[in-house]
C-alpha cells in the first residue's frame, strides 16, 4: 500500500510501499515501538514512541489543517479505514505532505516530562 515517509536524517519526504506488517513500520521509521498521531481523520503519522529519549534526535513539524505538531524521528503516513480500523494507502500526495512539513534545525530538542495533578 502507498505510504509517505518523512525522513529527518536526509530531510526528504517520499512515497514508499508499505507491506502492511508491523516489522515494515519498525524498519521504515527505524524504531522498536511506535505511536500514532491522527492528522486529519483519514490519515495518521506513525512515529518512534521512544524518539524523545534518543540522543542526537532530529525533529520535524507537521502543519495539519487545524494545528501543528512537532515530532521526533522519522514519520510514516498511512491512511485509516474508519470502519475497520485498518491501515490503508494514504489519501495524501507527496506534494501535499512536503508543503506541510518543516524539518527542525540540528540541536532542536523537546525535553520529555510528566506532571501529576491532584484531583480535588
Identify the role of each PLM range.
Residues 1-120:
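Domain-length accessory/inserted modules outside core catalytic folds
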Amino acid at each position: 500500500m502507498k505510504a509517505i515517509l518523512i525522513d529527518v536524517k536526509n530531510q526528504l519526504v517520499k512515497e514508499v510501499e508499505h507491506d502492511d506488517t508491523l516489522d515494515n513500520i519498525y524498519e521504515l521509521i527505524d524504531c522498536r515501538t511506535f505511536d500514532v498521531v491522527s492528522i486529519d481523520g483519514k490519515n495518521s503519522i506513525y512515529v518512534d514512541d521512544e524518539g524523545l529519549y534518543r540522543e542526537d534526535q532530529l525533529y520535524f513539524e507537521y502543519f495539519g489543517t487545524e494545528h501543528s505538531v512537532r515530532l521526533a524521528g522519522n514519520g510514516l503516513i498511512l491512511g485509516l479505514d474508519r470502519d475497520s480500523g485498518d491501515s490503508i494507502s494514504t489519501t495524501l500526495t507527496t506534494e501535499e505532505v512536503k508543503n506541510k512539513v518543516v524539518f527542525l534545525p540540528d540541536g532542536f530538542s523537546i525535553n520529555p516530562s510528566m506532571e501529576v495533578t491532584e484531583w480535588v
